[in-house]
Swiss-Prot record:
Interacts with PRKCB. Interacts with TRAF1, TRAF2, TRAF3 and TRAF5. Interacts with BIRC2/c-IAP1, BIRC3/c-IAP2 and XIAP/BIRC4. Residues 343-359 have a biased composition (Basic and acidic residues). Residues 403-424 have a biased composition (Low complexity). This is Receptor-interacting serine/threonine-protein kinase 4. The active site is at residue 143. It comes from the Eukaryota. PANTHER family: ANKYRIN REPEAT AND PROTEIN KINASE DOMAIN-CONTAINING PROTEIN (PTHR24198), RECEPTOR-INTERACTING SERINE_THREONINE-PROTEIN KINASE 4 (PTHR24198:SF65). The gene is RIPK4. PROSITE patterns: ANK_REP_REGION (PS50297), ANK_REPEAT (PS50088), PROTEIN_KINASE_ATP (PS00107), PROTEIN_KINASE_DOM (PS50011), PROTEIN_KINASE_ST (PS00108).
C-alpha cells in the first residue's frame, strides 16, 4: 500500500509494507545500525531483507532518518548499489533485496578467495562509488567498509548502508554516532578525526576505499591487533596505515599496481588523493583501477584518448551521467550486447603466471555493429559489461572472436539459452543492470550439443588456470558437471593444480564429496598432491573426511604416506578416524611406519593411536617399520607401553625376522638391545639367523651369532643356516658360518650336506670353501655325491673344482659322459 504524500511515510516511488506481508522472520545480523532480518514476502514468493531500527520505539526523528536513507538508496539506483523496495510500518524498517552471500566482511573472514574474485570486488566497489560521486551533487557514503559491501549469490558487489550518506559539503564530523564506531574508525580518514568542523568531500570515501583494498588483498581486518579506539585514531592521525605484509607468495602482478593505488588513496593530505569522478576518463581513480586490473601490456594514451591494448583497440569511457537517461541506456546496452560477445584477450590476468602472447586471439581490427573501425567510443556501462566478469577482459569483435584459441576447432554451439548465472528467483528482484543476458543462436546440424560445448569450455578454463574465464562461463547447473572421465570439475581443478579455480568452484557450492571412477574425492586428490590451500577450503565445508577410494584409502592415509604434517593435523582436527583400514588392513599409522614418516607417527601417537592394532596377517606398525628399516620409528614404537618387540605376524615372524631378512643391521641391533629373542622361530621354524643366512646379509648374521643365535638350529624342512647360505651361493655368509664352527657335515633334506646343495646349484666358489677330504665324496640318500649333482646340473666350473680337489669318478658319474655339455667333456677327460 502506498503512503500518502502529506504523511511522514511519503516515499515517492517507494512502497510502504505492513508486517503481515512478510513471514519467516530470521535474524541474520545486528549491530549499531540495528537488526537485519531475512523475511519472505507472502505474495512475491521471494526473500527480502528488513533493516530495523535499534530502538524498540521509533520516534519521528528516527523515522525521518530511515526515510532519508531509503530515498538516498532509491535515488542511487545502480547495478552495484543495493536495491531498496520501501519501508515496513511496524516494526519500522527498511525493506531491501536480500543478499544471499552476506557482507564482504563475512566472506573475507571465511576462506581464501580467488584472486580474480578479489580484483572483481575491488573493481565493482570502485564503479559503485564512482556512480555515487557522479551524482549532482555527489552523494558521499561516509561509511564505506567491508561490512557495508554486500554480495549477491554470484558474488557481485552491492554497496549498502547509506545511514551516514550526505550530499557533498552538507555534513559535519559531529554527525558521526558512536554506535558502531569501533568497526568504522579504521576506515575514517585522518582529517575527519582531526578537524571537527571540516566539510566532507569525496576524498573521505577515497580513503575508506583504500582501506577496503587493503582488506580485500590481505583478507584481514585493519589494525586488528589494536583493541583501543583512541590508539587507532592517534595512529591514523600520525600517518600510520595498516602494515603491508607480503600479500601472497604467488600473487598476481596486478597486486603491485593495486598496492600503489591504495597508497595514493590513503595519503594524509586529501588534496593528493585521486578521485572517483572526473572528466573524459571517468575520473582518475576509476582509470587507475582499470589500469591496475587490465592486462599489463596495455597502456593509457593521452587524456581523452582512452586505454590502448596491444591489439590497437582503444577504449574510451564517458561519465555515466552524461545524460539523464544513462541508467536506462545502460540496461538497454546490456540487453543489446550478449555475454557471448564479451571475449577474453590473450593477456587476461593469470593468477599463476603471465600468459604467453597469442596473436591469433587479439586481432588488429575490431568489428562492431555494421561498420568496421579502429577506434570505438565506449560508455562506462559498456566498459563495465566487458570487465565485470573477469576484470581483466578486453573488448573484441563479436562472432569471429567468440572462441578462445583452444576452442577454435570446436563447431559453434547449438541452440539453447544460457543463464547469466542468476537464478529465476533472484533475477526477479535484482537491481537494474545487474543481469547479463545472452541470446539464442541458430542451430546447426553439425554443431556439438550445448552441454558438450559448455563442458569443453569449462575444462579448458580450468586446465589453463583461467579463473576469470571460469567466473564468466560457470553456470549454477554446471558446478557438479560430470566429465567423461567420471570426475567433477572440482576433481579436475585439484588434479591440474589450479587452486584459484578450485576456490571459485567451492564458492559456488561445488559438492566436495563427489567421487570419480576410482572412488577418490577432491579431498583425496588435494591431500595426495599436497595442495594445502584446497585442503583447508574443503575441510571448511561439510565433507566426509573418512571417505574411501577404491583401495579403501582415506585422505589421512595419503597424508600419512606423504609425511604431510599440515594436512594430517587439519584432518585430525576434523575428526578423521585414525583406525580406518585399507584393503590390506593398514591404518594411517601402518602407512606412516611403512613409509618412514616419523613426524606423522609422533602426531598419531600424541593422539593416542593404538600401536598394537593389527593389520592384514597380524602385521603391527612395528613390523612395517622394521621391514622398511626405519630406525627412528622402530626406536619410537618399541619403547611405547604395551608394545612387544617379539610380536609375531600370522606366519610367526617377529620384527627381528623382518629386519634380518632385509639386512637392516642397525634395526636388528636396536631390537636385540631391546631384548628381542634371537632364537624365536616362525611357523616354518626359521630363526632370524636362518633368514639372514638365506638372504646373504652377513653383517646381520654375524650380529645374531655374537648375540647367541643357534648355529645348528634347523627349519621345519631340516635346513641349518649353513645349508641355506650354501644353497643360495652367499660366499661371505658361508665363510662366516665356517669360521664360527658351523657343522659342515650336518645333513639336511635328502640327507644332503651344505656341499651337496652348493654343487647342485653350481656355486663353485662356495664349493671351493666347503670342499674337504671328509665331505667331497659323501653320498646323499639317493647315492649321489657332490660331483654327481654338479654334473647332473651341467655346472662345468663346479665339476672342475671338485675334480681338482680329487673328487672320485664312479659309474654314476660315467653315465653323464654321453652328454655334449662342458661337464660331460670334463668327466670323459678325467676318466681318460
Amino acid at each position: 500500500m502506498e503512503g500518502d504524500g502529506g504523511t511522514p511515510w511519503a516515499l515517492a516511488l517507494l512502497r510502504t509494507f505492513d508486517a503481515g506481508e512478510f513471514t519467516g522472520w530470521e535474524k541474520v545480523g545486528s549491530g549499531g545500525f540495528g537488526q537485519v532480518y531475512k523475511v519472505r514476502h507472502v505474495h512475491w514468493k521471494t526473500w527480502l531483507a528488513i533493516k530495523c531500527s535499534p530502538s524498540l520505539h521509533v520516534d519521528d526523528r528516527e523515522r525521518m532518518e530511515l526515510l532519508e536513507e531509503a530515498k538516498k538508496m532509491e535515488m542511487a539506483k545502480f547495478r552495484y548499489i543495493l536495491p531498496v523496495y520501501g519501508i515496513c510500518r511496524e516494526p519500522v524498517g527498511l525493506v531491501m533485496e536480500y543478499m544471499e552471500t552476506g557482507s564482504l566482511e563475512k566472506l573475507l573472514a571465511s576462506e581464501p578467495l580467488p584472486w580474480d574474485l578479489r580484483f572483481r570486488i575491488i573493481h565493482e566497489t570502485a564503479v559503485g562509488m564512482n556512480f555515487l560521486h557522479c551524482m549532482a551533487p555527489p552523494l558521499l557514503h561516509l561509511d564505506l567498509k567491508p561490512a557495508n559491501i554486500l554480495l549477491d549469490a554470484h558474488y557481485h558487489v552491492k554497496i549498502s548502508d547509506f545511514g551516514l550518506a550526505k550530499c557533498n559539503g552538507l555534513s559535519h564530523s559531529h554527525d558521526l554516532s558512536m554506535d558502531g564506531l569501533f568497526g568504522t574508525i579504521a576506515y575514517l580518514p585522518p582529517e575527519r578525526i582531526r578537524e571537527k568542523s571540516r566539510l566532507f568531500d569525496t576524498k573521505h570515501d577515497v580513503y575508506s576505499f583504500a582501506i577496503v583494498i587493503w582488506g580485500v588483498l590481505t583478507q584481514k581486518k585493519p589494525f586488528a591487533d589494536e583493541k583501543n579506539i583512541l590508539h587507532i585514531m592517534v595512529k591514523v592521525v600520525k600517518g600510520h596505515r595498516p602494515e603491508l605484509p607480503p600479500v601472497c607468495r604467488a600473487r598476481p602482478r596486478a597486486c603491485s599496481h593495486l598496492i600503489r593505488l591504495m597508497q595514493r588513496c590513503w595519503q594524509g593530505d586529501p588534496r593528493v588523493r585521486p578521485t572517483f569522478q572526473g572528466n573524459g576518463l571517468n575520473g582518475e581513480l576509476i582509470r587507475q583501477v582499470l589500469a591496475a586490473l587490465l592486462p599489463v601490456t596495455g597502456r593509457w594514451r593521452s587524456p581523452g584518448e582512452g586505454f590502448r591494448l596491444e591489439s590497437e583497440v582503444i577504449i574510451r569511457v564517458t561519465c555515466p551521467l552524461s545524460s539523464p537517461q544513462e541508467i536506462t541506456s545502460e540496461t538497454e546496452d546490456l540487453c543489446e550486447k550478449p555475454d557471448d560477445e564479451v571475449k577474453e584477450t590473450a593477456h587476461d590476468l593469470d593468477v599463476k603466471s603471465p600468459p604467453e602472447p597469442r596473436s591469433e586471439v587479439v586481432p588488429a581490427r575490431l568489428k562492431r555493429a555494421s561498420a568496421p573501425t579502429f577506434d570505438n567510443d565506449y560508455s562506462l556501462s559498456e566498459l563495465l559489461s566487458q570487465l565485470d566478469s573477469g576484470v581483466s577482459q578486453a573488448v573484441e569483435g563479436p562472432e569471429e572472436l567468440s572462441r578462445s584459441s583452444s576452442e577454435s576447432k570446436l563447431p559453434s554451439s547449438g541452440s539453447g539459452k544460457r543463464l547469466s548465472g542468476v537464478s529465476s528467483v533472484d533475477s526477479a528482484f535484482s537491481s537494474r543492470g545487474s543481469l547479463s543476458l545472452s541470446f539464442e543462436r541458430e542451430p546447426s546440424t553439425s554443431d556439438l550439443g550445448t552441454t558438450d560445448v559448455q563442458k569443453k569450455k569449462l575444462v579448458d578454463a580450468i586446465v589453463s588456470g583461467d579463473t576469470s574465464k571460469l567466473m564468466k562461463i560457470l553456470q549454477p547447473q554446471d558446478v557438479d558437471l560430470a566429465l567423461d572421465s567420471g570426475a567433477s570439475l572440482l576433481h579436475l581443478a585439484v588434479e591440474a593444480g589450479q587452486e584459484e579455480c578450485a576456490k571459485w568452484l567451492l564458492l559456488n557450492n561445488a559438492n566436495p564429496n563427489l567421487s570419480n571412477r576410482r572412488g577418490s574425492t577432491p579431498l583425496h586428490m588435494a591431500v595426495e598432491r599436497r595442495v594445502r590451500g584446497v585442503v583447508e577450503l574443503l575441510l571448511a565445508r561439510k565433507i566426509s573426511v573418512n571417505a574411501k577410494d577404491e583401495d579403501q584409502w582415506t585422505a589421512l592415509h595419503f597424508a600419512a604416506q606423504n609425511g604431510d604434517e599440515s594436512s594430517t593435523r587439519l584432518l585430525l582436527e576434523k575428526n578423521a578416524s585414525v583406525n580406518e583400514v585399507d584393503f590390506e588392513g593398514r591404518t594411517p599409522m601402518h602407512v606412516a611406519c611403512q613409509h618412514g614418516q616419523e613426524n606423522i607417527v609422533r602426531i598419531l601417537l600424541r593422539r593416542g593411536v593404538d600401536v598394537s592394532l593389527q593389520g592384514k596377517d597380524a602385521w603391527l606398525p612395528l613390523h612395517y617399520a622394521a621391514w622398511q628399516g626405519h630406525l627412528p620409528i622402530v626406536k619410537l614404537l618399541a619403547k611405547q607401553p604395551g608394545v612387544s618387540v617379539n610380536a609375531q605376524t600370522l606366519d610367526g615372524r617377529t620384527p627381528l625376522h623382518l629386519a634380518a631378512q632385509r639386512g637392516h643391521y642397525r634395526v636388528a641391533r636396536i631390537l636385540i638391545d631391546l631384548c628381542s629373542d634371537v632364537n624365536v622361530c616362525s611357523l616354518l621354524a626359521q630363526t632370524p639367523l636362518h633368514v639372514a643366512a638365506e638372504t646373504g646379509h652377513t653383517s646381520t648374521a654375524r650380529l645374531l651369532l655374537h648375540r647367541g643365535a643357534g648355529k645348528e638350529a634347523m627349519t621345519s624342512d631340516g635346513y641349518t643356516a649353513l645349508h641355506l647360505a650354501a644353497r643360495n651361493g652367499h660366499l661371505a655368509t658361508v665363510k662366516l658360518l665356517v669360521e664360527e664352527k658351523a657343522d659342515v657335515l650336518a645333513r639336511g633334506p635328502l640327507n644332503q650336506t651344505a656341499l651337496h646343495l652348493a654343487a647342485a646349484h653350481g656355486h663353485s666358489e662356495v664349493v671351493e670353501e666347503l670342499v674337504s677330504a671328509d665331505v667331497i665324496d659323501l653320498f646323499d640318500e639317493q647315492g649321489l655325491s657332490a660331483l654327481h649333482l654338479a654334473a647332473q646340473g651341467r655346472h662345468a666350473q663346479t665339476v672342475e673344482t671338485l675334480l681338482r680337489h680329487g673328487a672320485h669318478i664312479n659309474l654314476q658319474s660315467l653315465k653323464f659322459q654321453g652328454g655334449h655339455g662342458p661337464a660331460a667333456t670334463l668327466l670323459r677327460r678325467s676318466k681318460t
